[in-house]
């Protein structure tokens, strides 16, 4: 695209140095009007400075929105109904935030008459894919500007020089290279790059912001109860909470006990491996509690089938296909499994660990009168003989055929 191709663009704007440089670059490169959009998804930053900075740079249309409840209710909770893990360990804290931001970019573009959207994701990572797949799925004719793929500002020195040349304030801590990049929302904080690029190097303890070191966690365990209704958490220790408030409280409780740290090397959609370190205290507790309630309330075959689908579902979210028809199809099936998942999990938190110590449900499939080791009157053990012989029939016939 060149000057004149774009009249108005909506920029995903954090107020930080990089997106402020992008803002000015868009104005210079395309001679277009820029609308800024800043989302509060629980990153824990004051957002008013983003407004002030945008105003200082001449922006007239500024959108700053609190999306925390929508983020947890419509994105995090649906994902957690599947006990979703990417590559067996990652709770997808970054991946699940991108569809909501991308959706609002498109909606604001439509509301303001903008013909393009722009983001600050680099050309090496997954986020560019997630933002753009979302935008194209919701508005096929949208134009997308990804500055990191087109400009020549590929070093910190060049970025700083550009900022100073255009009177963009440069915080003192931005003059040097940051030891790592950080992304935060209500579900997690992720750390990548620089000091973490060597996968053999242990992260510095002072990097972590949500969790204490397990060694420094309290010497006394804490017990909590989490209530679920139809697969979604609704209360902690009997206190009803909104989705965002519930996750925030679990973050605080889990962080205090060193719960939810993860260090992994993952396979990016763009083809390379990357090392990331994550803090997901509330999400870790939520998943363990959810699985505990499911153990009482989900039919065996339903649970096993859902668990077989989960890796594909996780891959779709990781790769940016939240609004794809196959994800929506899987979501409908997952949501159907959760109609009976109502109950309570009791958990023990101690020095980085989350242990299930109790679970209950009004409509539990667990029957003590059937599983007791004491004498019972409801289960005829003679029935097992025919069950075993029928299941063994093909094994016996196979052996007989091989021996003949």
Curated annotation (Swiss-Prot):
InterPro entries (alphabetical): Arginosuc_syn_C (IPR048268), Arginosuc_syn_N (IPR048267), Arginosuc_synth (IPR001518), Arginosuc_synth_CS (IPR018223), Arginosuc_synth_type_1_subfam (IPR023434), AS_cat/multimer_dom_body (IPR024074), Rossmann-like_a/b/a_fold (IPR014729)
SUPFAM superfamilies membership: Adenine nucleotide alpha hydrolases-like (SSF52402), Argininosuccinate synthetase, C-terminal domain (SSF69864)
Domain of life where this protein originates: Bacteria
Positions of L-citrulline binding: 90, 95, 126, 130, 181, 190, 266, 278
Residues that bind L-aspartate: 122, 126-127
Top class in the EC scheme: ligase
Keywords: Amino-acid biosynthesis, Arginine biosynthesis, ATP-binding, Cytoplasm, Ligase, Nucleotide-binding
CDD domains recorded: ASS
Assigned protein family: Belongs to the argininosuccinate synthase family. Type 1 subfamily.
Catalytic reaction(s) noted: L-citrulline + L-aspartate + ATP = 2-(N(omega)-L-arginino)succinate + AMP + diphosphate + H(+)
Record's subunit section: Homotetramer.
A Pfam short name: Arginosuc_syn_C
Protein name per UniProt: Argininosuccinate synthase
Assigned EC number: 6.3.4.5
Gene name for this UniProt entry: argG
Any single GO BP term: argininosuccinate metabolic process
Annotated residues for binding of ATP: 12-20, 39, 120
Keyword Nucleus: no
Keyword Ligase: yes
Localization per Swiss-Prot or TrEMBL: Cytoplasm
GO MF term (any one): ATP binding
Metabolic or biological pathway: Amino-acid biosynthesis; L-arginine biosynthesis; L-arginine from L-ornithine and carbamoyl phosphate: step 2/3
Any one Gene Ontology cellular component term annotated for this protein: cytoplasm
């Amino acid at each position: 695209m060149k000057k004149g191709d774009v009249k108005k663009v909506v920029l995903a704007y954090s107020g930080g140095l990089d997106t402020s440089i992008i803002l000015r670059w868009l104005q210079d490169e395309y001679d277009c009007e820029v609308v800024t959009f800043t989302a509060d998804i629980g990153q824990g930053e004051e957002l008013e400075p983003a407004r002030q900075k945008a105003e200082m740079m001449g922006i007239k249309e500024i959108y700053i929105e609190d999306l925390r409840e929508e983020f947890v209710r419509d994105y995090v909770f649906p994902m957690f109904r599947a006990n979703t893990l990417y590559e067996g360990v990652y709770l997808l804290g970054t991946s699940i935030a991108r569809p909501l931001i991308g959706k609002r970019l498109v909606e604001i573009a439509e509301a303001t008459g903008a013909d393009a959207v722009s983001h600050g994701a680099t050309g090496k990572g997954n986020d560019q894919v997630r933002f753009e797949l979302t935008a194209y799925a919701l508005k096929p004719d949208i134009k997308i500007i990804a500055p990191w793929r087109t400009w020549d500002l590929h070093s910190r020195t060049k970025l700083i020089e550009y900022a100073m040349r255009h009177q963009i304030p440069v915080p003192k801590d931005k003059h040097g290279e940051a030891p790592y990049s950080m992304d935060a929302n209500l579900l997690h904080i992720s750390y990548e790059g620089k000091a973490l690029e060597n996968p053999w190097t242990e992260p510095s303890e002072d990097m972590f912001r949500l969790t204490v070191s397990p060694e420094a966690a309290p010497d006394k365990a804490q017990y909590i109860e989490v209530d679920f209704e139809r697969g979604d958490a609704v209360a902690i220790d009997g206190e009803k909470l909104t989705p965002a408030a519930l996750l925030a409280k679990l973050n605080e409780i889990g962080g205090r006990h060193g719960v939810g740290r993860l260090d992994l090397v993952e396979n990016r959609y763009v083809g390379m491996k990357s090392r990331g370190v994550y803090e997901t205290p509330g999400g870790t507790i939520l998943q363990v509690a959810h699985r505990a309630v499911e153990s009482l309330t989900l039919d065996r075959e339903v649970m096993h089938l859902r668990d077989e689908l989960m890796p594909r579902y996780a891959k779709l979210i990781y790769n940016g296909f939240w609004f794809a028809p196959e994800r929506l199809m899987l979501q409908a099936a997952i949501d159907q499994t959760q109609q009976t998942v109502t109950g309570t999990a009791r958990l023990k938190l101690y020095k980085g660990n989350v242990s299930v110590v109790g679970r209950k449900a009004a409509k539990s499939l667990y029957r003590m009168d059937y599983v007791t080791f004491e004498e019972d009157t409801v289960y005829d053990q003679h029935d097992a003989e025919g069950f075993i012989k029928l299941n063994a029939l093909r094994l016996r016939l196979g052996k007989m055929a091989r021996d003949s």
